[in-house]
Amino acid sequence: MSRIVEPPTQRQGARRVWSDSRGRIWVAEWNSGNLSMHDPALGMGANSWRTWKAPGADPHVYAVYVDDQDIVWAAEWSNNAMLRFDPGSEKFAVIPMPRPAANIRQILGRPGEVWLPESGTEFISVIKTG
């Protein structure tokens, strides 16, 4: 059965979601510039959500992906960067993209790699994680 789960941030502009190995749902919020996580094990209320503001000036988070180590990757358009978020430490690392206006709309990967198709440049970047 499917059910609608609304992020708690008003008009957040959710763009992409990805789940981790624990079944938590990670959400890229374009309008708010947040990375949010919903934990269904905690129910449907406000306490089932956690939210982190992406670093940088006026962030816009578009795509999100969780790798095989449960590290969360997010594309941040305003600062043309990839964000690496460690849920354990709750810290972001910022990785600038090598080409202007990469505009990553979807992130994929396999163990040891994160694939970044750049819709703005028609390149594919790969980050080696292992």
Model-derived features: positions:
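Conserved beta-strand positions in repeat-built beta-propeller and related beta-rich domains
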Residues: 25-31, 72-78, 116-120
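Intrinsically disordered, low-complexity linker/propeptide segments enriched in Ser/Thr/Gly/Pro
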Residues: 1-7, 26, 35, 39-41, ...
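Short loop/turn segments that connect beta-strands within beta-propeller blades
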Residues: 39-44, 86-90, 128-130
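Beta-rich, blade/repeat-based domains predominating
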Residues: 8-24, 56-69, 100-112, 121
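A short beta-strand motif characteristic of beta-propeller blades
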Residues: 2-7, 48-54, 91-96
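Ankyrin-repeat and related helical/solenoid repeat scaffolds used for protein-protein interactions
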Residues: 65-114
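A short loop-to-beta-strand structural motif that recurs across blades of beta-propeller domains
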Residues: 34-37, 81-83, 123-125
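Long terminal segments
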Residues: 107, 117-120, 124-129
